Amino acid sequence: MLRSLIILLSVFSAFSLIGNEETSVAKKSLESKTNDKNDKQQKEDVSDELSEKNTVDIRLKIITSQIKNLEASMKPYTESIFGTGEKFEMIPIPSGQFFMGSPENENDRSESEGPVNEVKISPFWMAKTETTWNCYTLFMYAEEEKMVMKIRGYKPGLNKVSDAVARPTTPYVEMSFGMGTDGFPAISMTQHAANMYCKWLSAKTGHYYRLPTEAEWEYACRAGTKTAFSFGDDEKLIDEYAWYGDNSDEKYQKVGTKKPNPWGLHDMHGNVSEWVLDQFFEDGYNKYNEIVSDPFIYGKELYPRVTRGGSWMDSPADLRSAARYPSSEDWKEQDPQLPQSIWYHTDAQFLGFRVVRPLIIPSSEEMHKYWTTEGEPD
């Protein structure tokens, strides 16, 4: 009896050991499978991430290639303002890098022109000349635009999109101040007015137009040069390229009558100062501490904004490629429209603008941002 009991206990113990071993083996097998599964999932996750990055890289390469192909096909063209008969010329500006600002040893430089920074610029077109009264008047005087279109046989209903753009109230003084209109640069507008013109022009033409950024303006003005002016450092040559205080007969002159810069742009030095989009800061380009692409300092304050190029009133030093000048609220002290339209007119008879058209069309949100840099009237 005792012997049988001992045998039974031995058999039970043996089965228990076998069971424990099987359980242990099964547990290890399960853990191994789980680890294999986790390793596989991790590998799949890494693979997915690499695949996504690869897709992003491929997309970037495709876009870059397409942009290069598009840029290679960029040519000068003449833009027509629908229904009016008015036209203006646009010049292609290639992408590239340049040193923005003036070196410390440049004569007559100001602190706000530095420090010099290397900047990358995307391709765009720029108007060959400053915006003329011939084009701007159609925006400023809505009734004149309608009359011109009617004479040319166009129905008012074709203007619905451009008619929705805000425009100035009709000024009660002659805005050229007797200096001439046909072929002369438009003057005395606020930055907001220039922006609204660009918006109206885009609606009229089907091409996206805006003011240039400060970096785009200087890049186009320099046209590959590193000197104080696009024609070199010798101020004695300035009469060939610019209207300024000593040769302007105390008024602006017809656009495009002086020599162009190396890229075919006229009056980048002198005639009228030109609005750009950026906020003005006295410490210049300190925010650019490395190579930056298409920089643009969006304005949070109404004053000051940047103007470029110098004007018919200025000295040669103010016409340098790197020279910059801040806008002032004083320019509105004798606003010919006060108090009705403080958003559109100034008495700054030296101030105008020219338009640019980026090669790549931005989103509608970006368009709105560029067109509302001076805020919107209440």
Task: Annotate each predicted stretch with a short phrase.
Residues 2-21:
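Classical Sec-dependent N-terminal signal peptides that target proteins to the secretory pathway
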Residues 26-83, 364-378:
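N-terminal pre-domain segments of enzymes
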Residues 51, 100-108, 120-231, 237, ...:
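Active-site microenvironments of metalloenzymes and redox enzymes
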Residues 81, 266-269:
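Hydrophobic alpha-helical segments, especially N-terminal targeting/anchoring helices
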Residues 84-100:
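Mature N-terminal segment immediately following signal peptide/propeptide cleavage
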Residues 106-119, 225, 248-251, 269-378:
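Surface-exposed recognition segments
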Residues 226-252:
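Chymotrypsin/trypsin-fold serine protease catalytic domain
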Residues 258-261:
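Short, small/polar residue-rich loop motifs at catalytic or cofactor-binding pockets
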